[in-house]
Design a protein with these regions (language model features):
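Hydrophobic alpha-helical segments of small multi-pass membrane proteins
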Residues: 61-71, 84-99, 125-133
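Membrane-interface loop-to-helix entry segments
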Residues: 21-36, 79-91
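Alpha-helical transmembrane segments in multipass membrane proteins, preferentially the mid-helix core
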Residues: 39-43, 74, 93-105
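Juxtamembrane boundary at the C-terminal end of a transmembrane helix
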Residues: 137-147
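Interfacial loop-to-transmembrane junctions
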Residues: 100-130
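Interfacial loop at the N-terminal end of multi-pass membrane proteins
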Residues: 1-28, 50-54
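Membrane-interface helix caps and helix-loop-helix hairpins in membrane proteins
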Residues: 71-83, 103
């Protein structure tokens, strides 16, 4: 969702903490993160498709993607900080769930069959986890400051 001038004006009037990053940083950060997400999801869905991973492993990844794309609509489309806060908490929760599930299944498969471990995906997603953790704290703070 592209920010029009009304949305930009609305967002710029919100109270933000002093440690809030400048607006220009979000584009480059999300570009890198979406590349990581694409590789991660592509790998996971391919492994599910080829039956190297169980179908259920895709659930937290699908939910994470839905919540991730919903955030922009809640925050900038509806201009609703509370819904955006709930959504980003769900993004963080499903991300942790997805990576933990992948780790558990990968470890079990590796130990029982000798299949290669997929823990590289967890390591590749550390920037995503860190950014979403930071963004969650930022969004909750913005919501609190503007209640």
């Amino acid at each position: 969702m592209e920010m029009d001038s009304n949305t930009y004006n609305w967002y710029s009037t919100l109270l933000k903490p002093s440690w809030s990053p400048p607006a220009w940083i979000f584009g480059p950060v999300w570009t890198v993160l979406y590349a990581i997400i694409a590789v991660t999801y592509g790998t996971v869905f391919y492994k599910v498709y080829t039956k190297e991973l169980p179908l259920i492993i895709a659930l937290p990844f699908v939910l994470n993607l839905i919540f991730n794309f919903s955030f922009t609509y809640f925050q900038f489309g509806l201009k609703n900080n509370l819904l955006a806060s709930i959504d980003i908490l769900l993004i963080l929760a499903t991300l942790i769930w997805a990576l933990y599930s992948l780790y558990a299944v990968s470890l079990t498969n590796h130990l029982s069959t000798g299949a290669p471990s997929l823990t590289w995906i967890i390591y590749a997603n550390i920037p995503y986890v860190l950014w979403v953790s930071f963004a969650t704290i930022l969004q909750l703070t913005i919501t609190f400051l503007n209640k």
